C-alpha cells in the first residue's frame, strides 16, 4: 500500500456497527447527535495528527492511538461508544439540570471536540444550568479556533451544532 494513502471508513457503516455493540443502549446522546459528532470528526482507520497535532484514529479517538497501527471499523465503533460515554459521564458532573435533547447533543458534540474540562468550564454550561437554552446555544460559535487561529472546519461544525441546538431551545 502506498504510505501516502489514507485508509478511511464510512461513518454510516461504523455507526451501524456501533448500534450493535454493548454500551450503545447506555448512551444519552441521540442517534442524530452521534451523526453530528461523527460527520465532523470523520472516520479514519489509520492514525493521523489532527489540526491540534494530536494523534487520532477512528471517529475522533485520541485514546491509545499508536502511530502507524491500522484499526478495524469495529474497533472504531467501540472506541466511539466508549468516548461518547466518557464525555457524557464527565458532563453529568457539571450539568446540573435536565436538558432538552438537541441542546444536550450539541453540548456533547462540543465537549467531544474541545474536551470535557473546557466544556464544563464554559459559559454554555453556565447558561444550561440556568436553563437559558438559546443563550447556551449561541455560545457555540465562539469555539472556532485552534491554538488561537480561526478554523473554517470548526466554524462549519459549530454552525451545524448551533442549528441543531436551537431546535431544542
Regions found by a protein language model. Give the residues of each.
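A structure-centric signal for secondary-structure junctions around beta-strands
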Residues: 51-54, 104
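Amphipathic alpha-helical segments that form the core helices of the histone-fold
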Residues: 57-62, 108-112
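Long, amphipathic alpha-helical surface segments
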Residues: 1-52, 61-65, 71-88, 96-98, ...
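Short alpha-helical scaffolding segments that buttress acidic/His motifs in well-ordered protein cores
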Residues: 37, 103-112, 139-141
Amino acid at each position: 500500500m502506498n504510505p501516502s494513502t489514507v485508509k478511511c471508513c464510512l461513518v454510516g457503516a461504523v455507526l451501524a456497527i456501533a448500534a450493535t455493540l454493548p454500551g450503545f443502549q447506555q448512551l444519552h446522546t441521540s442517534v442524530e447527535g452521534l451523526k453530528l459528532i461523527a460527520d465532523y470528526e470523520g472516520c479514519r482507520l489509520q492514525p493521523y495528527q489532527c489540526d491540534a497535532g494530536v494523534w487520532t484514529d477512528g471517529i475522533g479517538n485520541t485514546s491509545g492511538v499508536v502511530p502507524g497501527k491500522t484499526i478495524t471499523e469495529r474497533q472504531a465503533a467501540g472506541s466511539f461508544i466508549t468516548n461518547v460515554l466518557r464525555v457524557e459521564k464527565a458532563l453529568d458532573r457539571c450539568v446540573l439540570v435536565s436538558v432538552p435533547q438537541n441542546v444536550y447533543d450539541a453540548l456533547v458534540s462540543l465537549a467531544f471536540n474541545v474536551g470535557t474540562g473546557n466544556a464544563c468550564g464554559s459559559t454554555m454550561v453556565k447558561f444550561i444550568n440556568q436553563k437559558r437554552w438559546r443563550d447556551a446555544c449561541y455560545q457555540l460559535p465562539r469555539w472556532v479556533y485552534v491554538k488561537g487561529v480561526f478554523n473554517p472546519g470548526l466554524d462549519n461544525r459549530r454552525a451545524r451544532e448551533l442549528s441543531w441546538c436551537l431546535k431544542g431551545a
